[in-house]
């Protein structure tokens, strides 16, 4: 890890301690609202009042502020990194996933109370750690990385979804802590001396455990939606040690949309219709996870 990654640990731990970095939990309603998200309505001219009513002496209650649900969408690869290459049509993964991500962003941003962002919006490379940093800087409630799979055998097919495998994650946290000077390691403004390192490790472990648990819930919703439009490669949420899934304070999933190495799936991935179906499936899984009643498509 470079010094930039290490310097983030104090901020992460401080947020864990005071709760300021905690994202929405699965099925949590946006704060201040019990109504489901709806499409943003067009502004209408106020209708003429036909009857005069006696004004109330009591002041009307202020409308509670609705918390915006922030979704960071990560189109994999980009620039000099094309990702997987299709066998028959030489379709590049970086192009397909960017198209899906752009559709997903556009559709989610039509939902009131939802804000969707991209880690890249063009054909350029973004380092993996920078993608995570962008999500944290935006205070994202959810992170979804979109990819297209490939395998040596052309028979492999289907959609997959991954969350972080926490095995070995404690050692990663230990390396971060070891690189950080004691006088700058802060949890809620408290200096982390050597005797406090164990506390920091415990907090990091608790945060990662919670992140993976929430990610599994969201992932299951998304995978169920994907099963409606495409065959699943495996019928369950899988776990792997992907670098882009390592934000300890943001539930994160990685979606493998289909196999570019499979001739039929490569052909489908090239079509706008299937790209839109994928975007809708991912978006609807996310919305369900956060308790929204609106659906894309």
Which residues does each PLM region occupy?
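Active-site-adjacent mobile loop/cap segments within catalytic or ligand-binding domains
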Residues: 91, 152, 203-297
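Short, basic/glycine-rich phosphate-binding loops at helix/coil junctions
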Residues: 198-202
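Catalytic-core regions of hydrolytic enzymes
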Residues: 20-197, 208-220, 280, 296
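Short intrinsically disordered coil segments
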Residues: 11, 176-180, 270-274
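Generic hydrophobic, helix-prone segments enriched in Leu/Val/Ile
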Residues: 9-13, 176, 203-206
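Surface-exposed edge beta-strands and adjoining flexible/disordered loops or tails in beta-rich
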Residues: 1-27
């Amino acid at each position: 890890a470079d010094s930039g990654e290490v310097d983030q640990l104090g901020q992460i731990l401080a947020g864990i301690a005071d709760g300021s970095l905690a994202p929405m939990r699965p099925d949590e309603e946006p704060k201040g609202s019990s109504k489901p998200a709806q499409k943003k309505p067009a502004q209408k001219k106020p209708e003429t009042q036909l009857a005069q009513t006696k004004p109330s002496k009591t002041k009307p209650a202020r409308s509670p502020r609705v918390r915006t649900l922030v979704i960071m969408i990560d189109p994999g690869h980009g620039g000099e990194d094309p990702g997987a290459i299709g066998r028959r049509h030489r379709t590049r993964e970086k192009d397909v996933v960017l198209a899906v991500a752009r559709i997903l962003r556009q559709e989610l941003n039509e939902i009131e109370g939802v804000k969707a962002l991209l880690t890249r919006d063009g054909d350029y490379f973004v380092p993996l750690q920078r993608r995570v940093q962008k999500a944290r800087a935006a205070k994202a409630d959810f992170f979804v990385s979109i990819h297209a799979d490939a395998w040596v055998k052309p028979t492999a097919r289907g959609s997959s979804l991954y969350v972080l495998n926490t095995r070995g994650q404690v050692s990663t946290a230990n390396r971060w802590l070891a690189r950080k000077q004691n006088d700058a390691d802060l949890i809620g403004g408290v200096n982390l001396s050597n005797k406090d390192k164990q506390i920091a490790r415990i907090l990091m472990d608790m945060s990662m455990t919670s992140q993976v648990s929430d990610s599994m819930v969201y992932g299951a919703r998304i995978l169920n939606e994907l099963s409606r439009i495409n065959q699943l490669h495996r019928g369950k949420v899988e776990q792997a040690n992907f670098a882009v899934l390592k934000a300890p304070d943001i539930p994160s999933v990685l979606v493998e949309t289909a196999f570019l190495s499979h001739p039929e799936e490569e052909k489908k991935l090239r079509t706008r219709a299937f790209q839109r179906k994928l975007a809708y499936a991912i978006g609807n899984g996310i919305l369900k996870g956060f308790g929204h009643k609106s659906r894309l498509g």
